């Protein structure tokens, strides 16, 4: 096998593919990359993730009479996801496979901004009737502020670090997973709602695929916890992941924010909460009761003015149809659901809980609610 190809663009980016012979091994296949702007390539696909950064690296694949092996070093400078900075990412990986393709060995290290955050060591054995894996993964002070870039919009930002270690053993299709995860000074903040929860620093054990929560605490702004007990079983297929979790909290301050910028919700909010989630991922039972306590004083700001809300409000409110006109019948809009979810929830507002609603961002039009009541909601599937 021989190759010699070089592609460059105005001296800024380079793609090079070539072979060489060093006298010891058969021809090796080499690849070099430099100055590749990811956004210029990913824009070619409408399904590509919103990743940006400058890609560079090199890779080599080689073989002899006993092994095929390869190693690569890849770097993405100023990597971002959805316009949120992740950092400078480095991946160093090595892979080897026996000539009969019965055993594969892997080793990988990942760094973020020059600090090691993850390692992988393992092998796969295909010489048995069912493929067996032996894999060790370690997470070392992964900065959650950078990982927040991958969270969906509206879920807030995280701070602190994540540590962990996992061992995967047994059949490749359904390995046994054991290890633990541990947050270090971690907090989840949703700035637009003045909400913050601090994660417990204790280990979260994973035993045979079960992620266990033993009185695990998420603390509100006043230090009072929401306590989780139960487990999530990851030992099955994705749609068969089974959960059995109960959560309970008393006088937890879930909102503690000040009026500023385009914040939608601010003030102080205190709740009692009881909840439970049980069942498979595609067939869940959820129960929850949330009491908004006295002492709560919240202000919600409509970011759209009341004038804009009323414009066109009378359009499409009433539509007259002729039921005998079969030519205008539309197809059923109710598609079969891939999963079922049963929900039973109650929201209780206690006396002396105050709510203010600013109908315009400047606060000139507003409503104040000082009352009590209960709202129930249920869903069968």
Predicted region positions:
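Interface amphipathic segments
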Residues: 1-165, 173-273, 280-374, 380-381
């Amino acid at each position: 096998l021989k190759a010699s190809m070089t592609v460059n663009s105005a001296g800024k980016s380079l793609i090079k593919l070539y072979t060489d012979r060093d006298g010891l091994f058969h021809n090796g296949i080499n690849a070099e990359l430099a100055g590749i702007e990811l956004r210029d390539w990913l824009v070619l696909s409408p399904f590509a993730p919103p990743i940006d950064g400058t890609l560079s690296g090199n890779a080599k694949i080689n073989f002899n009479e006993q092994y095929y092996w390869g190693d690569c070093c890849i770097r993405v400078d100023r990597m971002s996801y959805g316009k949120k900075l992740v950092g400078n990412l480095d991946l160093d990986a090595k892979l080897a496979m026996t000539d009969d393709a019965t055993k594969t060995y892997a080793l990988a290290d990942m760094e973020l901004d020059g600090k090691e955050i993850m390692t992988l060591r393992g092998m796969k054995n295909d010489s048995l009737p069912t493929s067996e894996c032996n894999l060790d993964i370690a997470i070392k002070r992964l900065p959650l502020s950078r990982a927040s870039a991958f969270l969906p919009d509206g879920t807030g930002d995280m701070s602190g670090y994540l540590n962990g270690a996992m061992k995967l053993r047994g059949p490749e299709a359904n390995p046994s997973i054991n290890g633990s995860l541990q947050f270090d000074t971690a907090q989840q903040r949703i700035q637009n709602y003045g909400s913050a929860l601090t994660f417990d620093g204790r280990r979260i054990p994973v035993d045979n695929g079960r992620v266990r929560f033993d009185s695990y605490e998420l603390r509100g702004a006043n230090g009072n916890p929401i306590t989780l007990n139960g487990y999530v079983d990851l030992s099955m297929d994705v749609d068969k992941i089974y959960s059995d979790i109960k959560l309970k909290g008393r006088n937890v301050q879930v909102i503690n924010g000040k009026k500023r910028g385009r914040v939608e919700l601010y003030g102080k909010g205190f709740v009692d909460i009881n909840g439970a989630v049980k069942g498979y991922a595609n067939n869940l039972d959820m129960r929850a009761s949330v009491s908004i306590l006295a002492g709560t004083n919240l202000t919600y700001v409509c970011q759209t003015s009341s004038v804009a809300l009323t414009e066109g409000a009378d359009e499409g409110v009433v539509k007259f149809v002729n039921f005998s006109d079969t030519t205008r019948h539309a197809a059923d809009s109710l598609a079969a659901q891939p999963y079922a979810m049963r929900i039973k929830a109650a929201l209780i507002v206690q006396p002396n809980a105050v709510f203010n609603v600013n109908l315009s961002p400047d606060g000139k039009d507003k409503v104040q609610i000082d009352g009590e009541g209960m709202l129930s909601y249920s869903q069968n599937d």
